[in-house]
Amino acid sequence: LWVKNGKSFLEIIFKQVEQQNVRLALMNSFSTDRETREAISAMRTAVCPLIFLQHHFPKILKETLGPVSWPKNSALEWNPPGHGNVYTALWASGSLDELLKNGIEYAFISNSDNLGAVLDASLLGYFAENGFPFMMEVAERTPSDIKGGHLAIRKKDGQFILREAAQCPEEELTAFQDIQYYRYFNTNNIWVNLPFLNRFMQQAAVLSLPLILNEKTLDPRDPDSPRVFQIESAMGAAVSIFKGATAVLVQKSRMVPVKKCGDLLLVRSDRYLLTEDARIVSNPDCKTDRITIALDPRYYGKIDGFESRFESGIPSLLECESLTIRGDVRFEANVKIVGGVVIENRKSGQTTVKTGSVVSHDLVL
């Protein structure tokens, strides 16, 4: 999957590593390991990453609270346990020992889909100079961040904690979403002191991170398959466990995640540039500070549907404040979106935004 200028996430990450001359480690899941190794082999890169495997947990049937049995595809009986598993997997695989033997004392950990998360020497210096065991990068919450996890302080001991929406009782959701009270969210960019982590894991063996129950369908492609719980944890939650852990406020430019096709549309657009040193940065020609994207999940929710509707190119979003697409709409080349726009197709078949169109107001096709 290419993300910018025909380059994949891995290609951009590897170029960043080459530019910064640092060691790269990858945590793969059981479902991504083979494809990742094949992609790296095809790249013919000089970078030789340390690769270790994430553990896998059984999916739990919501109805019985027992483990899933799915003979038609036994691989669907398991799920990766979230990125909170990184500490245990790193230690149990022997990879932590290998890094320490090679003189590596500090790790910067981020999601591979967040290409804004490059290693920053000033942050590394701050982390090392102060002797922190753990440091979480946080950014200021905006109205678009109300559903994401936020940083808080535990009253009984003053320790930082991370609270996710899935851990919040329904009656507290209003307070959870108050961005004036809970001002900072976790970017999921984490700094870890590896000698400290090694000592901790030797004593504890596992991290008792807060449990996250994600309710999903057993088969992601079959909405009628049984409802299950996936047991997961978040790596940022370690901020509540490591004594002396801290947080540092960073610019939002260090968080450019691609979780959904709407995020991919944004990063592929002219609002972002890929620099010579493989950084994803905001285009200085942007006329708007913020933008929201809402794509109809029926037609843009899967990558194949998304690609087919933008095969002629991504619209210019330099002057766009918001873009909402409802219905089946295909875009031809050199389309420009200006301001806040809703494009809606109320017909049963697909319709098209023609080549060279400038859409500056709501459009019903």
Please report, for each region that a protein language model flagged, where it lies by residue:
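Domain-scale recognition of functional cores that engage charged ligands
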Residues: 1-236, 278
